[in-house]
């Protein structure tokens, strides 16, 4: 038996170099087929085993052993640096186009997701774990690294399918492992490249390799990217979503003996530009304002702002209901609730009438135009009209120490790592320009009563006036800058004063992690070998915040606060802190450890068996709260946190008493494992069958009002994977063909939805199956074709009732959809007897008459009606009167059984070809690639056509001229040749934002020229 090299073994996964084109395959525990590499060598291609076509066998360590790719059964796609260059794979978005059953798209809240075989990062939140393991130099890292670009890469390997036994707790979909180039101790070398392209794109990459002694070497690499934005902004006649970023990496390697190697790697990246987390928002405008956007199609419209928190709640109808809802603390089952609510409502309306609030329409008060009535949404995916330009600032550091020593038949590998990541990003929340609208007269009134020079001056309003309009209404309205003090404009924290409302959000995060792993493996000559290891991970994040603000929220906070303060006897202005929405995860902690091992049985030269097991243990803690208009404070307060911390508001309604934070701890443990049986028919043909179990830990949902039936936690997910495959080489190497079939039984798959402006997560079970075929065809040594095709079927396997936020009626035409004017969410009224539409409408009409609101109006094309009202009041009124209806505060759920999982295209294929032409000492290599991704759905509800993402294709081409011995080269390229604006993914916002759809697309057509050198 040959010695097994575990030089590259690590915390997540180890891989090896590939030939000069994409190579895919499936991996086995065939130890005796593994080439021998000393610790001073890179595990990579085996030139001694090169076939007649001239491309070398690929050696990988995906099972923590050096093995030929064609000998091992885990579906793997691998890319060398040369391959990345020739297929124009500069970032993960381009990478996914060439992979079977893999998609990658941007997501909501500054996130992104890899989806492998239908399993992706559908869980959004501080305590969520990624379903796809991401590793840099085999150290687990966060997904932020996927926002950068690839440089000085030795190889990238994507493992498809659960990898939990060897690679950890959160690899249920697979692993993406990025291996950077290491120092060469034998020679000095350097490389550099400059690229210029459209969008005034300038990209510089370089590296230098220096052997310091015979046993010590250093390698330094870096890149810089600067380009204009892809998104045109007609409001400013500029563009945004540009890049200004750089990264560098240093690697120090020490090989004191042939059996020992130590690598120390330091990585740093920084970005400061106008990258946008949003690209385009689509909406089929709802003329009633009850939904904002209709659940029919994705159109180039704008939401009806009357459906938003700033439009519905800050109306002359909504604000009194907001005050009454906040003041009446009786349960809706109390007989006194309805009369108390109506009395409170009657007392607040006269106080608010002079302040120029907008109107959604009610008896005697006609509707006023909503804030987006004149907003423009240009019908182009890369053109917007926005008055707030995004900002994006990130800083990442990753440090890795790897040590390996071979004691003979036993080898020990150690990996230790530390990382830190910071994010501070803002963006226009609605990608639209909205004026002050109906609030403008209110600011004139505020000037009249708050300016000491006015004959109507009242000192009660002076502080409110000075904070919002210190220069009078003509000088613009000052707006809060969302920050941790929670005071905004009323504590002097403002972004400026404007003639329109700047609707924007802000994401902030600061996280650290530490990990350590050790494993021991054997290389005995008998039929039995083993691997044993353990890993510990600790992560801490603080002040993970998400803010949303506009002038309407500032005005609501100050106006309601001042009136409430007057009711409490105050004679000066007050406000309700915070005057903006803030989801604040003050602290998150993760402690995780795993113990794993595998046993390898080689019965003969053809038949092998692998048995593995892993124990996972995860502990999570989070302290969080969501603030908006919670604590009454005097204007001029500079920090609202003492009020929040001191009992000024209750942030955990699930626990009796006043809680300053919602705190929760969870602990999960699971056993996972795998069994693999492979049979080598010939040296060129392998078949295998495997079973594996993957696991991803559960987590904690953000704190929400108990009005919404949202569980406090979400469960861990597990997947049982069954896979068969065959790997083949034919025609003396002219064809390599690998085929894999798989079936997954998924339990408690985590997926997210937006409730009350917050991501919450649910669990479902699913069945997944599919087939993948991958081929490399080389008719001649100069002509190479690579191709792959995949089929994927996913479906929810259980009866699971979930409420679709787009349509809380659940498709029933006898329902009445309610826009709650106190909180801007949607509830639904259903008749007790199905089909009794008159009963549900009659109940709402009678109740709204008591509230002074209009009755029901036609809303959806199927006959469903809607109305503005107060959901809690309707619930109390039903209990008081016994009306034959049900009031469902979180909507009427629908059964999603049989629906497809999001981001799971049924068909996906790609084909690429390159031809090498010798011209004297030069070579000319033209290449073209065609990639197709089939249709998919963006949500679990599978509504047609609004949730459907159509299939699309991307065409890339380039031609490169290499100098003698490849010392220099010149390359011309074009990516997305047809300028396709295809959608890669979508996300539906929540009801208080109007239910518009954020969509994300492929990158636009790029073209340019690059020149580089190597020595």
Spans of features found by a protein language model:
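Outer-membrane beta-barrel translocator/receptor signature
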Residues: 129-131, 143, 151-154, 160, ...
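Acidic, small-polar-rich N-terminal luminal/periplasmic segments of exported/outer-membrane proteins
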Residues: 46, 53-185, 724
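C-terminal beta-barrel architecture of Gram-negative outer-membrane proteins
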Residues: 827-868, 887, 901-963, 975-979, ...
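C-terminal beta-signal and adjacent terminal beta-strands/loops
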Residues: 794, 931-941, 961-1015
């Amino acid at each position: 038996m040959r010695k097994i090299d575990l030089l590259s073994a690590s915390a997540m996964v180890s891989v090896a170099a590939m030939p000069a084109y994409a190579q895919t395959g499936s991996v086995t525990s065939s130890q005796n087929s593994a080439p021998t590499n000393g610790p001073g060598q890179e595990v990579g291609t085996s030139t001694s085993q090169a076939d007649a076509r001239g491309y070398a066998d690929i050696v990988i360590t995906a099972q923590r052993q050096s093995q030929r790719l064609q000998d091992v059964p885990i579906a793997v796609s691998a890319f060398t640096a040369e391959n990345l260059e020739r297929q124009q794979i500069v970032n993960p978005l381009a990478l996914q186009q060439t992979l079977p059953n893999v998609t990658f798209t941007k997501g909501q809240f500054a996130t992104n997701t890899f989806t492998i075989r239908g399993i992706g990062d559908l869980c959004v939140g501080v305590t969520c774990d990624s379903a796809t393991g991401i590793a840099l130099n085999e150290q687990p890292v966060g997904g932020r690294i996927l926002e950068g670009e690839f440089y000085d890469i030795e190889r990238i390997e994507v493992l498809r399918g659960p990898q939990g036994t060897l690679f950890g707790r959160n690899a249920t979909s697979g692993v993406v492992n990025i291996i950077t180039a290491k120092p060469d101790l034998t020679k000095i070398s350097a490389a550099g490249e400059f690229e210029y392209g459209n969008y005034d794109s300038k990209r510089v990459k370089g590296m230098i390799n220096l052997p310091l002694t015979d046993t010590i070497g250093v390698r330094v690499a870096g890149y810089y990217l600067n380009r204009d934005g892809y998104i045109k902004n007609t409001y400013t006649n500029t563009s945004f979503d540009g890049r200004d970023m750089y990264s560098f990496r240093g690697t120090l390697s020490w090989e004191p003996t042939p059996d020992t190697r130590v690598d120390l790697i330091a990585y740093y990246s920084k970005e400061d530009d106008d990258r946008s987390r949003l690209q385009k928002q689509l909406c089929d405008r709802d003329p009633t304002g009850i939904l904002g956007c209709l659940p029919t199609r994705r159109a180039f419209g704008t939401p009806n702002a009357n459906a938003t928190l700033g439009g519905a709640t800050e109306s002359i109808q909504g604000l009194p209901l907001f005050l009454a809802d906040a003041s009446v603390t009786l349960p809706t089952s109390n007989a006194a609730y309805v009369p108390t609510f109506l009395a409170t409502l009657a007392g607040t309306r006269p106080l608010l009438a002079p302040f120029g609030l907008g109107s959604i329409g009610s008896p005697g008060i006609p509707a006023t135009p909503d804030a987006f009535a004149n907003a423009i949404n240009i019908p182009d995916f890369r053109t917007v009209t926005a008055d707030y330009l995004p900002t994006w600032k990130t800083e990442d550091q990753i440090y890795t120490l790897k040590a390996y020593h071979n004691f003979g038949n036993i080898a020990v590998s150690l990996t230790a790592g530390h990382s830190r990541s910071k994010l501070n990003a803002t963006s226009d929340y609605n990608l639209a320009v909205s004026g002050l609208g109906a609030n403008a007269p209110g600011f004139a009134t505020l000037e009249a009563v708050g300016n000491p020079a006015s004959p109507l001056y009242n000192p009660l309003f002076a502080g409110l006036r000075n904070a919002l309009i210190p220069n009078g209404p003509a000088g613009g309205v000052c707006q809060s800058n969302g920050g941790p003090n929670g005071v905004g404009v009323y504590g002097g924290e403002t972004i400026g004063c404007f003639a329109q409302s700047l609707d924007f959000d802000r994401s902030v995060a600061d996280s650290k992690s530490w990990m350590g792993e050790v494993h021991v493996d054997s290389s005995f000559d008998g039929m039995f070998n083993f691997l044993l290891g353990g890993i510990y991970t600790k992560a801490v994040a603080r002040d993970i915040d998400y803010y949303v603000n506009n002038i309407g929220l500032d005005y609501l906070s100050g106006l309601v606060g001042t009136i409430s303060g007057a009711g409490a006897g105050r004679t000066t202005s007050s406000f309700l802190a915070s005057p903006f929405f803030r989801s604040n995860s003050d602290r998150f902690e993760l402690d995780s450890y795993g113990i794993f091992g595998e046993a390898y049985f080689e019965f003969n030269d053809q038949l092998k068996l692998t048995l593995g097991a892993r124990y996972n243990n995860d502990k999570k803690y989070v302290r969080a709260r969501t603030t908006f208009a919670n604590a009454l404070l005097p204007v001029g307060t500079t920090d609202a946190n003492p009020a929040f911390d001191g009992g000024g508001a209750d942030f955990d309604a699930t626990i009796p008493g006043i809680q300053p934070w919602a705190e929760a701890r969870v602990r999960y443990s699971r056993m996972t494992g795998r069994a693999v049986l492979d049979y080598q028919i010939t040296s060129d043909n392998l078949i295998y069958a495997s079973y594996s179990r993957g696991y991803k830990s559960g987590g904690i949902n953000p704190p929400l009002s108990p009005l919404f039936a949202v569980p406090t936690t979400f469960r861990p997910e597990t997947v049982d994977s069954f896979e068969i495959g065959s790997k083949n080489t034919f025609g003396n190497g002219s064809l390599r063909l690998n085929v894999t079939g798989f079936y997954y039984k998924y339990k408690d798959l985590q997926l997210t939805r937006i409730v009350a402006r917050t991501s919450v997560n649910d669990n479902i079970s699913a069945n997944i199956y599919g087939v993948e075929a991958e081929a490399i065809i080389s008719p001649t040594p100069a002509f190479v074709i690579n191709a792959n095709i995949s089929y994927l079927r996913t479906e929810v396997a259980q009866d699971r009732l979930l409420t679709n936020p787009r349509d809380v009626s659940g498709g029933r035409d006898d329902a009445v959809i309610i826009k709650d004017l106190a909180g801007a969410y949607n509830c639904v009224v259903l008749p007790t007897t199905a089909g009794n539409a008159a009963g549900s409408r009659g109940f709402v009409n009678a109740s709204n008459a008591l509230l002074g609101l209009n009755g029901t109006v036609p809303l959806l094309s199927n006959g469903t009606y809607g109305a503005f009202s107060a959901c809690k009041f309707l619930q109390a009124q039903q209990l008081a009167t016994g009306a034959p209806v049900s009031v469902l505060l979180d909507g009427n759920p629908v059964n999603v059984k049989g629906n497809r999982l999001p981001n799971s295209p049924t068909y996906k294929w790609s084909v690429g070809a390159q031809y090498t032409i010798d011209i004297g000492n030069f070579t000319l290599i033209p290449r073209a690639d065609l990639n197709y991704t089939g249709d998919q759905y963006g949500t679990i509800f599978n509504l047609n056509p609004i949730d459907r993402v159509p299939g699309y294709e991307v065409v890339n081409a380039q031609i490169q001229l290499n100098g003698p011995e490849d010392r220099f080269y010149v390359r011309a390229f074009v990516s997305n040749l047809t300028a396709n604006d295809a959608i890669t993914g979508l996300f539906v916002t929540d009801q208080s934002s109007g239910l518009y759809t954020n969509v994300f697309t492929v990158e636009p057509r790029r073209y340019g020229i690059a020149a580089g050198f190597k020595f």
